[in-house]
Amino acid sequence: SYLVKGDDGTLGIVGDAFSEIAKMSGIRITEVNLPRKRLRKMMAKGKLDAIFSAIEWEDDVSRYVWTNGIILVSDNIVMRADSNLRVRQTADLKGKSIVVRADYKYPSLDPLITNGEVTSHKANKFENLLRMVERKHVDLGIIDQNVAKWIIRKEGLKFSAPLRFVSPGFDEVQYRVILLSKKWLPQVDAFNEALAKLKHSERWQEILNQYR
């Protein structure tokens, strides 16, 4: 099976969990990293068996089958620690400039961006997003804080001013494996059973600790 693996912490957790379950089940998989535009083209051509995603982010999910959620993710507001802005929820973003990831969906923010109530800039990489916040190119950034902290640790990033994340996050979704053909439906129950066993094992905590 071919399945897309990204380079951020959240996808790393999902990818490692999937690989672990595949080993337990004797399934061979090939994981590939793809830019989002190329990913969509390969999906349309039927060249992928599965992707890591959230069903809330995919169009016409009735065409697919999917596993139980592997990990819960959300968007957090990030700002410089010395910022005087008081922002606790998405409504507080009106009139602000923010940076988001290119090609990502933000259900709570997209209407504000479309209406011009929020000025948005797009970053192609998580590090670029964090740097734009650090350098005051924008007021705020939007990123899952667990992913951000993993990127900072993995890349050894240093900032001229500390960054602060606002909790709780918003637009919570479950990352899962989305199978792009219904031929996989018979395997989903077995996958979910193996996933439940993994989450009750020491190995699951080891996977999480690698990224947090």
Predicted regions and their residues:
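Extracytoplasmic small-molecule ligand-binding "clamshell" domains
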Residues: S1-S62, K122
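A ligand-binding cleft/hinge motif common to bilobed small-molecule-binding domains
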Residues: K41, S53-R63, D139-D171
